[in-house]
Swiss-Prot record:
Pathway recorded for this protein: Cofactor biosynthesis; biotin biosynthesis
Protein name: Pimeloyl-[acyl-carrier protein] methyl ester esterase
Reaction(s) catalysed (UniProt annotation): 6-carboxyhexanoyl-[ACP] methyl ester + H2O = 6-carboxyhexanoyl-[ACP] + methanol + H(+)
Name of the encoding gene: bioH
Organism: Aliivibrio fischeri (strain ATCC 700601 / ES114) (Vibrio fischeri)
Subunit-structure text: Monomer.
Amino acid sequence: MTTPLYWQTEGEGSDLVLIHGWGMNGAVWQTTSEKLSQHYRVHTVDLSGYGHSAELGCADFDEMVKQVLAQAPKKAAWLGWSLGGLIATKAALTSPERVSQLITVASSPRFSAEKGWRGIKPLVLSQFTEQLKTDFTLTVERFMALQAMGSPNAKQDIKLVKKAVFSRPMPDQQALATGLMILADIDLREAVSQLSMPVCRMYGRLDGLVPIKVAHDMDELMPNSAKIVFEQASHAPFISHNDEFISELRTFLNQHA
């Protein structure tokens, strides 16, 4: 039997799963889940190799998706931030009967930039991979700074993310390396048109990792999905614009309940 992932569940109501991004853990949702738990039964997970699931070590992309599905509620709305958006999207594609609504935050079906598609330059991803080998704590901190870049409250945002992440065990080094490979290699662009449940895509207009051009390109790939852009936010709108984020999320979930 596989060792279970670490989950936190709070609140009552319809089920909502929250999935963190690369280098992070479920504590990053603390303020968000406290507020959402007044309306929903909120489930936050530490992915394999992260936070309280760090000792489980590394898992590849498909295995990560299976691990979350194995312990998630039978049917729930799934919300994934950044790398977590890829995992939530893949879960919705492989097990659509389990995902009632899909929400992606500062995410993309293809994170790596290529001709005709905006994203993270492959060189940046390979530099992070190299830095991991020498100082993975510093690498995670640099990624946090990159996430907040552009936000008017960048310093405060980084402080909040750091506090959350460092409140739990540091991620497994190999899990971090595998996560960067996922960001570099996974491409779900052709698959997303198959999604049948209501989908909401949330973006920060100032995001340096998922450029706003991606939001417009996704309008063509997913014409039936909802799109929300937080004008003054960067890569973590649920941290920099928490009340606005929760209001938009609740509106979408209520419309598609």
